[in-house]
UniProtKB/Swiss-Prot annotation:
Native organism: Oryza sativa subsp. japonica (Rice)
Listed CDD domains: DPBB_EXPA_N
Protein name as catalogued: Expansin-A28
GO biological process terms held by the UniProt record: plant-type cell wall loosening
InterPro entries: Expan_Lol_pI, Expansin, Expansin/allergen_DPBB_dom, Expansin_CBD, Expansin_CBD_sf, RlpA-like_DPBB, RlpA-like_sf
Expansin-like CBD domain boundaries: 170-249
Record's GO cellular component terms: extracellular region; membrane
Gene from which the chain derives: EXPA28
Length: 255
């Protein structure tokens, strides 16, 4: 019995040491809850505009970010490594586990509730409302909310950057998805086969807008990730494109 007790104490000490070391190694403290059901179907759609996360390749390991982290949509697509902080709530954490999620949604503030009593996503709290599958990788279901340690990490994606062009006539809305590296975009421009480069403005989430007549032209994009890498993707959209169609490039971000 004493041997068992010794190893239990040792394991707890290692968890605390691990969390302390993580915090000192570029990790940030925050909190996490979960939503969306066991299959994460309730996380589809969202404020980034990705729609069906299954078909878009983002899968079930995703999260809605609090206002402080969402940054007006500029954080859409970013990847975060998250672990439950067992140094604070060992009874609710799955010690030694971590999960990588993609930011796909906004967890809106609830001003009717206090920041420490239900208003988990209120500024300035760094909070992740995780999909249930992601949550259950690191925490016990019954906990409801746990303290976490997190850091932004590199995103890995299969295939190239994708562009979906929606809109009408003199208004194009370009959804950019499947972004590797930093996962998110800080600037975009488009060039029609009959135009020069036209800067795009973020409309909402990962959707960027252009107020020009581009129908019937092949489209090229110049995209800068939040990591600072710029890709020029020439004629990825052929001149016969139609609104609502998605086109996949053969280029991808490293950072």
């Amino acid at each position: 019995m004493m041997v068992i007790r010794f190893f239990a104490v040792l394991a707890a000490a290692l968890c605390i040491t691990s969390a302390s070391a993580a915090a000192a190694g570029g990790w940030v403290s925050g909190t996490a809850t979960f939503y969306g059901g066991k299959d994460a179907s309730g996380t589809m759609g969202g404020a980034c505009g990705y729609g069906n996360l299954y078909t878009q390749g983002y899968g079930v390991y995703n999260a809605a970010l609090s206002t402080a982290l969402f940054n007006g949509g500029a954080s859409c697509g970013q990847c975060y490594l998250i672990m439950c902080d067992a140094s604070k709530t060992p009874e609710w954490c799955k010690a030694g586990t971590a999960v990588t999620i993609t930011a796909t949604n906004l967890c809106p503030p609830n001003w009717a509730l206090a920041n420490d009593d239900g208003g988990w996503c209120n500024p300035p709290r760094p909070h992740f409302d995780m999909s249930q599958p992601a949550w259950e990788t690191i925490g016990i279901y019954r906990a409801g909310i746990v303290p976490v340690l997190y850091q932004q990490v590199k995103c890995w994606r299969q295939g190239g950057v994708r562009f979906t062009v929606s809109g009408f006539n003199y208004f194009e809305l370009v959804l950019i998805t499947n972004v590797a590296g930093s996962g998110s975009v800080q600037a975009m421009s488009v060039k029609g086969s009959k135009t020069g480069w036209i800067p795009l403005a973020r409309n909402w989430g990962a959707n960027w807008q252009c107020n020009s007549a581009l129908v019937g032209q092949a489209l090229s994009f110049r995209v800068t990730s939040t990591g600072g890498q710029t890709l020029q993707i020439n004629s990825v959209v052929p001149e016969w494109w139609e609104f609502g169609t998605t086109f996949t490039s053969n280029q991808q971000f490293d950072y």
